[in-house]
């Protein structure tokens, strides 16, 4: 039997100052032959009212954060935001891709699906408000996981990473907001724009933000923008 181990990092923000409480836990499910560690964040108010279900955002990091050191995952994106923002209004799940994989691999897509299902079963997740975002390799993974399970997601925000245009017809039920640096030479704007054009051709809903003066790092300005999170919350999966 192959065990897929999930290392859970519970982050509960303190009510005073900027201090944080962190609880470590270990869990496992039977799935693929990968070991998937992840950071897990519950909103400060999660324990206050047990009748409230919370939106969830899945964050997929880039190529440089792969491995088995969760500290790397905290460097960019959603984990960086929740480390500094006391009132982040989402359950946040930030897995770490093993070194020998990329998010688009079928094994990883199935592992991510299992992870989300597990979180949904064990926490008060609003199943109509599950979102996914990622940067670079994680941007590519964002397109891929939505194509893999479009029914799970209410909206998606890939940053500086394209997808497979042949999957466009699978994406039409999910609104996309795509972000890209115009001067990016790691993942050229064309990668994102091909996906946008393919999605529009099949009737998908997509908006595009192109930063004219940015190179590959188009994620810092994006994740610092409150409008991204407002847009997430404006979309529900019926």
Each model region followed by its residue ranges:
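A domain-start/cap signature at the N-terminus of enzymes
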Residues: 17-56, 106, 133-135, 140, ...
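Gly/Ser-rich "nucleophile elbow"/oxyanion-hole loop immediately N-terminal to the catalytic nucleophile
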Residues: 44-52, 100-137
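Short, proline-enriched alpha-helix->beta-strand connector loops that line the catalytic pocket
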Residues: 88, 171-176
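Primarily recognizes the serine-hydrolase "nucleophile elbow" in alpha/beta-hydrolase
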Residues: 117-122, 128-172
């Amino acid at each position: 039997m192959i065990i897929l181990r999930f290392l859970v990092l519970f982050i509960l923000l303190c009510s005073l100052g900027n201090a944080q409480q962190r609880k470590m836990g270990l869990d496992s499910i039977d799935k693929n032959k990968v070991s998937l560690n992840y950071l897990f964040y519950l909103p400060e108010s999660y324990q206050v009212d047990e009748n409230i279900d919370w939106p969830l955002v899945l964050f997929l990091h880039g190529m440089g954060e792969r491995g088995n050191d969760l500290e790397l995952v905290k460097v960019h994106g959603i984990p960086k935001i929740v480390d500094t923002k006391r009132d982040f209004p989402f359950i946040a799940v930030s897995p770490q891709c093993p070194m020998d994989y990329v998010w688009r691999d079928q094994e990883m897509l199935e592992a991510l699906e299992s992870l989300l299902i597990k979180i949904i079963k064990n926490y008060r997740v609003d199943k109509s408000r599950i979102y996914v975002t990622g940067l670079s390799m994680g941007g590519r993974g964002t397109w891929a996981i939505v194509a893999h399970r479009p029914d799970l997601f209410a909206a998606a925000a890939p940053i500086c990473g394209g997808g497979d245009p042949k999957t466009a017809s699978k994406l039409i039920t999910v609104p996309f907001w795509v972000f890209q640096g115009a001067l990016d030479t790691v993942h050229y704007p064309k990668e994102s724009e091909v996906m946008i054009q393919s999605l529009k051709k099949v009737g998908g809903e997509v908006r595009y933000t192109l930063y004219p003066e940015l190179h590959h790092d188009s994620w810092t300005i994006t994740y610092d923008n409150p409008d991204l999170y407002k847009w997430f919350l404006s979309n529900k999966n019926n």
